[in-house]
Amino acid sequence: MQSWPDPEVPKLSGDSPALRLYDTADRAVRPVAPGPTATLYVCGITPYDATHLGHAATYVTFDQVNRVLRDQGHDVHYVQNITDVDDPLFERAERDGVDWRELGSEQIQLFRDDMTALRVLPPRDYIGAMESVDEVIEAVEKLLASGAAYVVDDPEYPDVYFRTDATEQFGYESGYDRATMARFFAERGGDPDRAGKRDPLDAVLWRAARDGEPSWEAPFGPGRPGWHIECSAIALNRLGIEFDIQGGGNDLIFPHHEFSAAHGEALTDSRRFARHYVHTGMVGLDGEKMSKSRGNLVFVSVLRRDGVDPAAIRLALLADHYRSDRMWTDDVLATAVDRLQRWRTAAAAPAGPDAAPTVARLRQHLADDLDTPKALDAVDAWCADVRTGIGSDPAAPAQIARAVDALLGVVIA
């Protein structure tokens, strides 16, 4: 599937410190130590609605990871999926009286437009679930053959399930106890009460064909892929086992990332699917959790339509640490708009303080678990010096503008 245009990223001189990120599985900030090619997998959208700020915060975060790794000299093999076959898409299409394929296509294009506006670097591989069905079928066949999966005893709907006990290490990624797993499994798309399952937490690999749902032929019966195995197959077939970073929002820690890891590990007889599991916090609105049920989602496309500069949206999302849950308010956006104006005014100045120390601080803060608040503060400090007339280097404003573009994805000149 086509992604979106790749913005030009300025090349900076000098060296960048090694990137360190918090790993959910190890509960610690650890160095990311890729080879010449860094490998990154980020779970994509289910295209039944427009890109809201929670989505945007996640993709901007991993764009920061991408930019830091590139600045360190790595080639980055970035893979992102699209869950273009799933219940929420069917339900929204039925509600709106449209074909689910048309709805998915429209929302994917809107997502592309939003990512382009936010200057998010596109993935090298942008893969839809429908594109990967053959890969999923092959993976499910292997899991059935190894005993890691089973078919429920249901002549009408012989779904295929993954055994939670198929890997000894199941649960290491989230670190959750059984009760927490059970709660999140029920809340986040699981089916603990499905008759015929050997364990309430066993996750569906292949949903047998139902009336009114798309299906594909498979040796174990017609149906469609489960959510978790899609990501396992897509990642393994493009990045291999133990790729560098698996990323997404913290609502994906369990069950999605736990099971996609377990599927991949069972398929390859490996202990670890990814070297780092990295998760972003949630975005709320005016003191409340942002959710579809509350009807308080803030959409990037609506902000853009209302004339908000996408660079200001990006700066607003970078103002808090990526792992923190944060609130979106009018004041947050106003602060970002003001900051963007101050940065652009300073970048247009005829001269300013030497850029090298500020660029070094930018790199240092971003390498330290993406400390974007401190990175923004470093640019703020340079701009404040320009306003007070400190510094006489005529090359500095352009150098700062290049660094802000390359490292933060924000154009100020």
UniProtKB/Swiss-Prot annotation:
Keywords, comma-separated and alphabetical: ATP-binding, Ligase, Metal-binding, Nucleotide-binding, Zinc
GO-annotated cellular components: cytosol
SUPFAM superfamilies in the cross-refs: Nucleotidylyl transferase
Co-factor remark: Binds 1 zinc ion per subunit.
Ranges spanned by the short sequence motif 'ERGGDP' region, renumbered to the chain: 187-192
EC number, as in UniProt: 6.3.1.13
Record family assignment: Belongs to the class-I aminoacyl-tRNA synthetase family. MshC subfamily.
Subunit comment: Monomer.
The name this protein goes by in its record: L-cysteine:1D-myo-inositol 2-amino-2-deoxy-alpha-D-glucopyranoside ligase
Lineage: Bacteria, Bacillati, Actinomycetota, Actinomycetes, Mycobacteriales
Gene: mshC
